[in-house]
Amino acid sequence: MRVLAAMSGGVDSAVAAARAVEAGHDVVGVHLALSRMPGTLRTGSRGCCTIEDSRDAWRACDVLGIPYYVWDFSERFKEDVVQDFIDEYAAGRTPNPCMRCNERIKFAALLEKAIALGFDAVCTGHYAKVITDADGNPELHRAADWAKDQSYVLGVLTHEQLKHSMFPLADTPSKAEVRAEAERRGLSVANKPDSHDICFIPDGDTAGWLAEKIEMTTGDIVDEAGTKVGEHPGANAFTVGQRRGLKLGTPAADGKPRFVLEIRPKENKVVVGPEALLAIDEIRGIKVSWAGLPIAEVATGDEFDCHAQVRAHGDPVPATARMERLTDDDGAERTNLVVTLATPLRGVAPGQTVVLYQGSRVLGQATIDTARSLQRAAL
């Protein structure tokens, strides 16, 4: 099988490519140049996609004896990931750029080009598993190492994309084993640190970066009753659940800290309140997609049991979900996902992604439109 190995320059993608070669596939390595911005390309940057990463990817391919190419996807990345990130924050939502990159770059643009060039699959170093059912249909599942599992950020993959995806690290019990294997194979990235920052914000200062991209205007911080309790330098720099950076001139009556409950970009207001008000047990999602073929209840509209996860390394909680068909004022029909949580979650923000699981299987995902407490709504 002809396999295109996406080489990030890290240890995971290097070992994944090595295993693909060892399995007898015809492997070609490619590194994606995703940015021309000096901040992400300079030596010493903490994000990914740096000059050092490109060199590390080349060295790994050289050790493995496979061809190496660099593909420039910087313009598409800027439009589909970076600009989307800016637009979402400007609208008062909290996006996940890694999911957007997987959805539109690594498993859309990259896979499309790979298929056009005659490759059968794209191989990455993600910790996730593709299982083929009895009818030959792919299913996305968690990796053996749940501590490193990345199935959440792959929940955006479609049935067709999963058919052409290869995750050689699926059954690896730990990251330590991956590093040990890299050492045995003579790969120089064996002890390279993991990258945790947003790649286009390498210094980790998201608020500072956004301040350069979005016009920030001073506005009011109000409590849940609408009373002004402070001022902010720009509502777009905040997210639901945040406490740090709030400059409150009026302390809470009970003396307890307050957290961001809501962002109102049109009013340029940040709503704050006690931590207890962050708890939600109903999520309504838009832009719904299914990882593989959807389960039967999706077509019938029946409620189904599942687990819901709202962060890449968050704990999944028991839930029920159903599809809700709505008609807009202009007569257009749309379908939303309604998720009811058995255990309330805190700090869930519009723009985040909810991913649904049954056991280890990823069912699908949706972008969170609203999140609320059914118990408080009933009062």
From Swiss-Prot:
Gene3D superfamilies, per the entry: Adenine nucleotide alpha hydrolases-like domains, HUPs, Translation factors
Disulfide pattern: C101-C199
SUPFAM superfamilies in alphabetical order: Adenine nucleotide alpha hydrolases-like (SSF52402)
CDD domains, sorted: MnmA_TRMU-like (cd01998)
One annotated GO molecular function: tRNA-uridine 2-sulfurtransferase activity
E.C. code: 2.8.1.13
Chief localization: cytoplasm
Alphabetically ordered keywords of this record: ATP-binding, Cytoplasm, Disulfide bond, Nucleotide-binding, RNA-binding, Transferase, tRNA processing, tRNA-binding
Database matches in Pfam families: tRNA_Me_trans, tRNA_Me_trans_C, tRNA_Me_trans_M
Site (described: Interaction with tRNA): H126, Q352
GO cellular component assignments: cytoplasm
Annotated localization: Cytoplasm
Catalytic activity field: S-sulfanyl-L-cysteinyl-[protein] + uridine(34) in tRNA + AH2 + ATP = 2-thiouridine(34) in tRNA + L-cysteinyl-[protein] + A + AMP + diphosphate + H(+)
Stretches for region Interaction with tRNA: 148-150
InterPro entries associated with the record: MnmA-like, MnmA-like_C, MnmA-like_central, MnmA-like_central_sf, Rossmann-like_a/b/a_fold
Active site: C101 (nucleophile), C199 (cysteine persulfide intermediate)
GO biological processes: tRNA wobble position uridine thiolation
Domain of life of the organism encoding this protein: Bacteria
Positions annotated to bind ATP: A6, M7, S8, G9, G10, V11, D12, S13, L32, G125
Function summary: Catalyzes the 2-thiolation of uridine at the wobble position (U34) of tRNA, leading to the formation of s(2)U34.
Family the UniProt entry places it in: Belongs to the MnmA/TRMU family.
Name of this chain's protein: tRNA-specific 2-thiouridylase MnmA
Organism: Arthrobacter sp. (strain FB24)
Gene: mnmA
